[in-house]
């Protein structure tokens, strides 16, 4: 399910085992500042990722993959440096340590993934998923951290802040969207730290961080859930992006 992430396998405080270029890693360090040294050849050419899939209906797996290149790459749709099999989602998920949550990145925005950044990809209804990237995805952006691309979607961004952490959920409206989970345009909710607020919308029994819905005429109800383990003040901010002036969220 979307709430089952498996177990992290610790490599210890140091390792001489070569790090795979088609596998992502999570680095944790308790000190205020720390310098790590990575030694190896610069990567170039096509890289294929080894992903874990599942053939069961309605079962989702998340795979952590790296940007293998010494340059930023653009997370985008198939044909723009990426080759994705049918069961791989169009959104990716990047850990945001400041918010204590995952940020959902839609492929339609052409967002930059910096050097050394790992990202989660979703696989559903596919036992043997295939994903590869080539040099066409590379870009000369000097962005040190994840940077969102431009989007022209009609969308509502809701942000919850509490306990020095935050979470966002996005509701977008498009003519081609459906009420069900759209693998290439929607994003599943990935839960973050217990100390951080968790915000998501509900549709067709699924929890969404990015929910694309059909266009509507008069009014539309969207179910939203908020969870927190923290007792204290919570701030909600709503942003309307490319939505016409008469539209008002309630």
Region roles according to the model:
Residues 2-240, 244, 248:
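Compositionally biased Ser/Thr/Gly- and acidic/asparagine-rich
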């Amino acid at each position: 399910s979307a709430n089952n992430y498996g177990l992290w396998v610790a490599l210890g405080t140091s390792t001489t085992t070569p790090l795979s270029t088609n596998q992502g890693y999570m680095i944790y360090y308790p000190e205020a500042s720390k310098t790590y040294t990575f030694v190896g050849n610069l990567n170039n050419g096509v890289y294929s990722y080894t992903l874990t899939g599942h053939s069961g209906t309605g079962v989702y797996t998340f795979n952590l993959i790296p940007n293998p290149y010494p340059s930023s790459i653009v997370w985008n749709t198939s044909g723009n440096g990426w080759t994705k099999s049918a069961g791989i989602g169009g959104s990716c998920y990047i850990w945001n340590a400041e918010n204590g949550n995952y940020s959902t990145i839609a492929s339609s925005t052409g967002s930059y993934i910096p050097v050394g950044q790992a990202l989660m990809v979703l696989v559903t209804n596919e036992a043997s998923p295939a994903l590869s990237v080539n040099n066409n995805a590379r870009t000369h952006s000097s962005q040190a951290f994840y940077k969102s691309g431009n989007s022209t979607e009609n969308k509502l961004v809701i942000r919850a802040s509490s306990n020095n952490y935050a979470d966002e959920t996005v509701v977008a409206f498009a003519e081609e969207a459906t009420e069900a989970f759209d693998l290439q345009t929607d994003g599943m909710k990935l839960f973050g730290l217990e100390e951080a607020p968790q915000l998501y919308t509900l549709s067709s029994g699924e929890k969404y961080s990015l929910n694309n819905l059909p266009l509507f005429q008069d009014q539309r109800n969207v179910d939203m859930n908020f969870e927190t383990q923290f007792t204290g003040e919570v701030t909600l901010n709503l942003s309307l992006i490319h939505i016409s002036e008469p539209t008002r969220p309630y």
